[in-house]
Curated annotation (Swiss-Prot):
GO BP field: generation of precursor metabolites and energy; mitochondrial electron transport, cytochrome c to oxygen; mitochondrial respirasome assembly
Record membrane topology: Single-pass membrane protein
Functional pathway: Energy metabolism; oxidative phosphorylation
Keyword Repeat belongs to the record: no
Function text: Component of the mitochondrial respiratory complex IV (CIV, also named cytochrome c oxidase complex), the last enzyme in the mitochondrial electron transport chain which drives oxidative phosphorylation. The CIV complex is the component of the respiratory chain that catalyzes the reduction of oxygen to water. Acts as an assembly factor that specifically drives the homodimerization of CIV complexes, mediating the formation of mitochondrial respiratory supercomplexes (respirasomes) containing two CIV: supercomplxes with two molecules of CIV show improved activity.
InterPro entries: COX7a (IPR039297), Cyt_c_oxidase_su7a_sf (IPR036539), Cytc_oxidase_su7a_met (IPR003177)
The protein, known as: Cytochrome c oxidase subunit 7A1, mitochondrial
Quaternary structure annotation from Swiss-Prot or TrEMBL: Component of the complex IV (CIV, cytochrome c oxidase), a multisubunit enzyme composed of 14 subunits. The complex is composed of a catalytic core of 3 subunits MT-CO1, MT-CO2 and MT-CO3, encoded in the mitochondrial DNA, and 11 supernumerary subunits COX4I1 (or COX4I2), COX5A, COX5B, COX6A2 (or COX6A1), COX6B1 (or COX6B2), COX6C, COX7A1 (or COX7A2), COX7B, COX7C, COX8B and NDUFA4, which are encoded in the nuclear genome.
Lineage: Eukaryota, Metazoa, Chordata, Craniata, Vertebrata
Amino acid sequence: MQALRVSQALIRSFSSTARNRFQNRVREKQKLFQEDNDIPLYLKGGIVDNILYRVTMTLCLGGTVYSLYSLGWASFPRN
């Protein structure tokens, strides 16, 4: 009997009302990403997307240059 009361209390505390604290912004995001304003899709999220894009590109290009440097260094053995 005690387990039944505990389970009912847990169900009440984790009900759907706790999920409604955040506003649903799907419609706003759909309008933002579907409008035709000649901005690339990966930059439509704002300044955070712009920074994330630049950091990702910098890391990718840096890794590519470093891997080519390592291949070149390994291909000429020391005597």
